[in-house]
Amino acid sequence: MEGDLRELIATVRQPDLHALLERLIGARADGWPPYRDAPAAKFYHQAYRHGLLEHCLTVGQAVSAISATFPGIDRDLAITGALLHDIGKLEAYTNDPANIELTDDGRLQGEIALGYYRVRREIEEIPGFPPSLAKELLHIILSHHGTHEHGSPVLPATREATLVHMIDNLGGRLGSFDRLEKELRDGERWSGFDRALGGGAYFAAHQQLEEPQRDAA
């Protein structure tokens, strides 16, 4: 995954955004080892070591692909927002895969606020970082949960923020399917109720594909 991440970062041509990514998650950055190892969540999706990297990379790759299809999207801004949208989780969760818990800062401030301030501090260390670009990037971080009910203080108001939010939400939901499928007992087609999905998940199509392979063997 690290190689894929480095390749994606290399495609960000805007110099200030590229410098910011290198400062925060570059190979020599202090934040790289925790970003590489952290879980993406406590329960719902990618709640395991390297889960945050896996999730952010997947969101970044999808954002990159969609940016090439829809006109008007600032690809560099969208990719940077995708890779950094969850960086507050480095401070919000303990980095122990066997016992993922919210930290005091995670409980008192929340991962969105922690991510906002972490990125803003680094932006302030880059001379000449365009203020308008900083506003749009920070807006992606603040709005990526999509609604006030889900914890975002503001709603997505730009193309890039809307794109990151929607792909982030999609990635989380599909990650829930992966988790639920692993929890199925032999012969089960439905998972139990899942809060993230608002119901159960159905997996019969996967079992039907696997059965002929077993018969052929």
Stretches with model-predicted labels:
Residues H45, E54, A65-E183:
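Divalent metal-dependent catalytic cores for phosphoryl transfer on phosphate-bearing substrates
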Residues A157-A217:
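Acidic, carboxylate-rich catalytic segments that either coordinate divalent cations
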